C-alpha cells in the first residue's frame, strides 16, 4: 500500500510518530491481527515558514495500491504485514513556564491555543503530557512542596505553588482533550536538604538517608494532583540522571537508580496503593540507553516495577551522531518493555 504525497510536511510528521513509539502493554498486541487501511484517509497538517500555515489542515490523502512511483513523486510505502512497537501517543510538556505564558495571552488566544493542540476534532489532539515535580529549568522560580528538613514523613507536603498557574493550565488541556490525556510527572531535583550538595542545582546526589522520604514524595505528589481532579498516568524516576546542570538536576548511576527503584520507590508506590501507575526509567539520551537497560532489566526485582524507558535526543550536542539503533537494540533485547 502507499499513500501518495503532494506535501513533504506529512513525511516529517510521520517520522516523528514512528520515533515516539514504545509501550509495554500495547506492544504485546501489535501482531494481534492484520492492519487494514480500507476506508482510512491521511489528514495532512502543514507548518511552513514564510506562509500562513501553522498546524494548518491542508488536505487529505488516500491509501491505494501503487507500483513504482515517478522520481519526482513523494510517496510513503506501507507494508501492513510488518509491525514494530505500538504507537502510544504524542504530546507536550506542561511546565510552569508554559502555564505562566499561557495565562499572559488574551482569553480568546488561550482557547485558540489549547484547542489547536489538545482538541481531537478541531486541533491535532495531543494525548500525552508531561509535567514537573518541584521546579525545573522551565520554572520562573525555585520551589519544592516541603521545606522542613526534619519532616521526613512529609506531613507538611502541599502543592499550593501549582494552584496559580500549572494546575488550572493542565485542567484546561485535559478538558480540551476530552479528559483523554495521559499525564506523567518527572522530578528534576529533590529538595536541597535531601541532596549531597545541599543545592537543587548543579547535580549532586540523593542522600541515602532520605531515599525513603524521597520515594514517598512521588506518591504525595500523585495523590495531591488527583485530589485536584488531575489523574496521573505515571512518573519517571529522574530527568536526565547523568547530567550536572546549572539548573535543577540530580545524578544517579544505573545501579543507584535501579536500587532506589527496587528498594524504595517501587515498594512505596505499592504500599500507597499506586501500583497501577507506570514507572519510566532513564529519561535521558539514546547513547547509554542500552547499557542502562541491561542494569535495570537484568535485575528481576527492579524490572517488575518498570513500564519502560524514556529517552531524549541530545546525544549529538557535542558533535556526535544520533544513536537511533540503540532503541532497536533495547527493544530486541527486552521486547516486553
Which residues does each predicted region cover?
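Sec-dependent signal peptide recognition
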Residues: 6-13
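N-terminal catalytic cores of secreted or lumenal carbohydrate-active enzymes
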Residues: 55-232, 253, 259, 263
Amino acid at each position: 500500500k502507499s499513500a501518495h504525497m503532494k506535501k513533504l510536511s506529512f513525511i516529517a510528521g510521520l517520522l516523528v510518530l514512528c520515533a515516539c513509539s514504545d509501550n509495554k502493554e500495547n506492544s504485546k498486541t501489535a501482531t494481534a491481527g492484520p492492519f487494514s487501511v480500507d476506508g482510512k484517509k491521511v489528514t495532512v497538517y502543514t507548518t511552513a515558514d514564510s506562509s500562513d500555515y501553522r498546524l494548518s489542515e491542508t488536505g487529505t490523502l488516500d491509501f491505494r495500491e501503487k507500483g513504482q512511483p515517478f522520481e519526482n513523486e513523494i510517496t510513503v510505502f506501507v507494508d501492513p504485514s510488518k509491525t514494530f512497537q505500538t504507537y502510544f501517543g504524542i504530546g507536550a510538556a506542561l511546565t510552569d513556564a508554559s502555564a505562566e505564558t499561557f495565562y499572559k495571552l488574551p482569553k480568546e488566544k488561550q482557547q485558540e491555543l489549547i484547542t489547536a493542540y489538545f482538541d481531537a476534532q478541531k486541533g491535532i489532539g495531543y494525548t500525552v503530557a508531561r509535567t514537573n515535580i518541584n521546579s525545573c529549568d522551565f520554572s520562573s522560580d525555585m520551589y519544592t512542596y516541603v521545606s522542613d528538613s526534619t519532616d521526613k514523613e512529609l506531613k507538611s507536603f502541599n502543592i499550593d505553588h501549582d494552584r496559580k498557574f500549572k494546575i488550572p493550565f493542565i485542567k484546561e488541556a485535559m478538558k480540551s482533550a476530552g479528559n483523554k490525556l495521559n499525564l506523567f510527572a518527572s522530578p528534576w531535583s529533590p529538595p536541597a536538604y535531601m541532596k549531597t550538595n545541599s543545592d537543587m542545582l548543579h547535580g549532586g546526589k540523593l542522600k541515602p538517608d532520605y531515599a525513603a522520604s524521597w520515594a514517598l514524595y512521588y506518591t504525595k505528589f500523585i495523590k495531591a494532583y488527583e485530589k485536584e481532579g488531575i489523574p496521573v498516568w505515571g512518573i519517571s524516576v529522574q530527568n536526565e540522571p547523568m547530567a550536572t546542570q546549572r539548573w535543577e538536576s540530580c545524578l544517579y548511576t544505573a545501579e543507584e537508580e535501579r536500587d532506589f527503584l527496587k528498594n524504595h520507590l517501587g515498594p512505596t508506590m505499592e504500599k500507597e496503593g499506586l501500583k497501577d501507575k507506570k514507572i519510566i526509567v532513564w529519561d535521558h539520551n539514546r547513547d547509554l540507553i542500552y547499557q542502562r537497560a541491561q542494569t535495570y532489566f537484568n535485575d528481576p526485582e527492579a524490572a517488575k516495577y518498570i513500564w519502560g524507558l524514556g529517552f531524549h535526543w541530545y546525544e549529538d550536542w557535542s558533535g556526535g551522531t544520533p544513536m537511533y539503533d540503540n532503541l532497536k537494540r533495547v527493544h530486541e533485547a527486552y521486547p516486553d518493555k
